[in-house]
């Protein structure tokens, strides 16, 4: 972060939004408007939501992704929109590990981690 100066100390922290309807991990216009509006609204730094680095590592099928060129292009749109709003841009990258196939909003079931709980296809 050397050489970067934020306009203030307010940061929008990353959150798990689960908002990719197409389940392809690609940024949508909703994401661009959502994050750009936070930048315009006064945050000095905007951190984009949890973004999976592989399809197998998603926390949900509706996560943003960063494993294809199409996704990278969408993330570029986000960065440009955040910068245009006057804020610095960051990203929370992640991988769900061995529990990547269990929906996080489900009640805990002893030993559950596979597609047996009506979850999405377990890839890992």
Language-model segments: which ranges?
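Catalytic domains of carbohydrate-active enzymes, especially glycoside hydrolases
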Residues: 31-54
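Short, basic, glycine/proline-bearing loop/turn elements
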Residues: 13-24, 62-65
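Aromatic- and glycine-enriched glycan-recognition loops and surfaces
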Residues: 25-31, 66-83
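Non-globular sequence segments
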Residues: 80-83, 94-124
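Glycine-rich, proline-tolerant flexible connector loops at the mouths of alpha/beta enzymes
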Residues: 47-72, 93-107
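N-terminal amphipathic alpha-helix/helix-capping segment at the start of soluble metabolic enzymes
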Residues: 1-11, 82
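Conserved, mostly hydrophobic/aromatic
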Residues: 12, 38, 42, 82, ...
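Hydrophobic faces of well-ordered beta-strands that scaffold small-molecule active sites
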Residues: 10-13, 46-48, 89-93
